[in-house]
């Protein structure tokens, strides 16, 4: 945000330099990102003087050029070749002398040099308005007041303004500081803390009066929730023209281009007081009535930029009896604005609902100075005041007459809010005690009203324009920023408490697992958390009512927050597959979002998605396709790398997978993985087999919290391996056999592995054969055959009892 130093001095007569003022504003929380020197005319018109045309004859070799003699006050007239049709003897004109730097339309500099034009020497240049950047006319040279003396500096004639412009990095909560008035309020409070007491000077409305009541326009507000306050007044017999130089300079200094006096005044009030205004051509208001209302969905409306827009049923509009004229608080319409022929206006000043304006602006892709302020919340109680200040300026600058009483529709006043400020809490949060009188002085300087003072604190009323100050902590922050962060002493003692609970740093675990997956040939992806609701029509597992929906989605593809990481992964896979990248292994860390009747939840996940071959063809080895068991191995290696074991395996029972497995520990789901349903894959035009794993990362991290690293000696005594084959039912899983075996012999059985699976001939229907290997070891002695046989017998008994297994 740009703030003019000269403009600030209209409110508060500071004697500090711009640099000192910038430092103070930064200390107050209005960070100055830069200070730039500003001159209202490029180059400051240096080298431009008033000249007196003594002679003007036809150029001997050019029909459209004149040869002139011009007195520039130094005693020796200059010969200047001029192409302007209006140059004549006796005129006073601006002359750019040799060595003067001028600027082209793109502000690029060029220098006046002595030279010849069609054989005749030219010792300078007689200038037009646009060549000096003080106007837009290029019809001819400027003709000045005949009373001016030759040699007078042209900058003195025009009135150049030199200024310094602050670039403020305004935080979103400081809506009250989005104007010169707002910044001046803070500056005054800061100066007061530095022992400088200055008056805050605000524009007076004492001269406001109604000239006549000949142009009454009725106002009706149909939606007071979206337009809590609406004011207006009519002004007639005004003349739309260029603004005076001082007003143009004010706007130029903050980067605005002057348009005409009426529009310039509304922009001036916006940046001076923070109140957006809008001027309607009164002759274009049908029915003599302004109606503030919403319109049916799909109503067409053409804005000032010539774009036809379809309105939403929630867009608040300013209408007459026949048509919409303006999107409230955002942008005007093409058919109701002020033009050069306008002689009467209806001037609007309002307070619109910030949320409504923000939604409308986003919906239509519009971002204006007005919407920027309305979205953040302006002062609802200066609406009429700002309107009156603007009306007075319309009288003085545009020659208008105030032709109606001010209409002010404000059915429910937005009240100031009250807070009790505790001295004890203030000292506790700041870290030291600030004198009570200093606290009261700071509050008063911030226009916070003191209602009552007790031994324990102060009862205060906070003005409505400070919508960011609603709690005691907010008030304490205000006191601290004005008192000065730099004045708070650093304590010589640092007190801290240390948690005894083992802390798992998520990012470190993610980094470890990400490195492991990268080593396995995976690539990390990062998908948008917003996704298309239509994806969820292909599964009954993820219910539409559990989706967190966006109130104002940018497109159909971004209308809900994802419940699953799957669909983003499939989008990425399909994108790559369409570019002939066939062997794909991807992973992503992210969050899913879930809507429940009484709350919303976020959960962390790690997703893996695999398609194609796990290896490529080489001269030594052919490529190998990925498989369910390849993905299972990746999942198990991740869990093993994290030190997680003892999980239980079971079948996935949802329609996301055509075949899949759940891994649980202590009845908490760690991961689910398997082959993605063809119905879902087909929606993304993927024909190959897709493998997907979904780690419930919150649960994985929770398991890590309880894991302790144990260090053991290298065993001195040998391991013993024994095998046997079991005849089992088809539904029995190896993981369940392994878990049962380890629970049967907890001390000596170190490892159980599956080394052969057989199904087919010579086996009963519904049966399969598993060949298992058992590693047995005693760390304190060598095992005897008798001890080993006893262990194997116990294992056989467990398998027979729990799984109905028989030895083959």
Please give the residue ranges for each predicted region.
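Glycine/proline-enriched, intrinsically flexible loops and inter-domain linkers
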Residues: 5, 23, 27-28, 40, ...
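Conserved mixed alpha/beta core segments that line enzyme active sites in large multi-domain catalysts
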Residues: 49-79, 260, 266-335
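Terminal amphipathic helices with adjacent charged low-complexity linkers/tails
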Residues: 187, 191-221, 398-426, 432-433, ...
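Extended, well-folded interaction surfaces typified by the phenylalanyl-tRNA synthetase beta subunit core
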Residues: 419-423, 427-582, 775-777, 787-808
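Mobile "lid/hinge" segments at catalytic clefts and subdomain interfaces of large enzymes
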Residues: 118-131, 137-143, 154-164, 291, ...
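A carboxyl-terminal module marker
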Residues: 2, 445-448, 468, 472, ...
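Short, hydrophobic beta-strand segments
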Residues: 2-7, 162-171, 228-236, 369-376, ...
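Phosphate-backbone binding interfaces of nucleic-acid-interacting proteins
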Residues: 1-211, 346, 365, 369, ...
